[in-house]
Amino acid sequence: MATQRASGLLQRLAQGSLVKQILVGLVLGILLAWISKPAAEAVGLLGTLFVGALKAVAPVLVLMLVMASIANHQHGQKTNIRPILFLYLLGTFSAALAAVVFSFAFPSTLHLSSSAQDIVPPSGIVEVLRGLLMSMVSNPIDALLNANYIGILVWAVGLGFALRHGNETTKNLVNDMSNAVTFMVKLVIRFAPVGIFGLVSSTLATTGFSTLWGYAHLLVVLIGCMLLVALMVNPLLVFWKIRRNPYPLVFACLRESGVYAFFTRSSAANIPVNMALCEKLNLDRDTYSVSIPLGATINMAGAAITITVLTLAAVHTLGVPVDLPTALLLSVVASLCACGASGVAGGSLLLIPLACNMFGIPNDIAMQVVAVGFIIGVLQDSCETALNSSTDVLFTAAACQAEDERLANNALRS
């Protein structure tokens, strides 16, 4: 009987809301650090194990997901989504650029167990580009062992294109391997509440409760930047497309898509909601049936903001100098990283080390930044998903309405 009860409890924990569990871990970590400093320092091992598991799985995750995605790409499907695709990419880059501006206007710092002396900063854009090029030609095994994400991406893309010519059995094997790695990531993420409990406890015990204010500032910068993109940048892009007041459409998408996505924290889970909203807006079915799932995959403005803000927070903490060309390059890299963050639990956080590589930040420190992301993830991930998913339907609606108006004007002229 006791075994059945224990099994039932474990099942409820495994199937329970990860957001609520992380919130509980966060609160318990704060309480333990407040009650007993020695005990809080002792449970820091849980956080260390969690970060170690993330470090172990992240390089393999990037390799398998990108390789499987390219190898299993379907050819021959004709769609009229070029304007939407352009808006997706432009919106993601604009979000990354806004995050760079926000991060320099309101610089955030983190509590990391390293100093600037541990870092050899790049002297400028030329050295950054040279480092990127050298990383691209790294041995694949060496890239995996040293978490060289640029090299991993190059090999994943190359192998993915090569495997397009392979037989279906090989493609299925690659896809199954990708699913297996994704399962391992989900398994690691399920331990996030325990890891966050250990990280928060040990961090507060060693640095004091003032750390929370540092995270509060980081959250304000992150969420403030997302609000800026949702309420200013995206409306500007929509106005450029439809040439009229964009806010009725913007607020409709935030209300009927963003709110759902905020609580589900999954762009994929929000696809049916976006489809229903597109139907309600009388959009072209052939267009939105393709653009909405595509948007859930590559339209990642929120992820671009998260990657940029947290990377620059690490840069500011370590005192690494950043010139304007390097900051612009970070916007491009963050946009590309964001497009690869879909379908992965905590995907945007796990791609932060790739952006950190640009500034010579070691993987150990980059994973501490990822851990900070998980600590604030209760709000960060919800806001990020709400921005991502609502933007999918917003840009789809803007492109469809612009095309309808163009056809109507052409009909009137003829």
From Swiss-Prot:
Transmembrane segments: 16-36, 46-66, 84-104, 143-163, 180-200, 219-239, 300-320, 332-352
Catalytic activities: L-serine(in) + Na(+)(in) = L-serine(out) + Na(+)(out); L-threonine(in) + Na(+)(in) = L-threonine(out) + Na(+)(out)
SUPFAM superfamilies in UniProt: Proton glutamate symport protein
Alphabetically ordered keywords of this record: Amino-acid transport, Cell inner membrane, Cell membrane, Membrane, Symport, Transmembrane, Transmembrane helix, Transport
GO CC terms: plasma membrane
Keyword GTP-binding (UniProt): no
One GO MF term attached to the UniProt entry: neutral L-amino acid:sodium symporter activity
Superkingdom of origin organism: Bacteria
Location within or outside the cell: Cell inner membrane
A biological-process GO annotation: threonine transport
Keyword Cell inner membrane: yes
Main subcellular localisation: membrane
Record Pfam families: SDF (PF00375)
Topology in membrane: Multi-pass membrane protein
Function: Involved in the import of serine and threonine into the cell, with the concomitant import of sodium (symport system).
UniProt record similarity statement: Belongs to the dicarboxylate/amino acid:cation symporter (DAACS) (TC 2.A.23) family.
The protein, known as: Serine/threonine transporter SstT
Organism (species): Salmonella heidelberg (strain SL476)
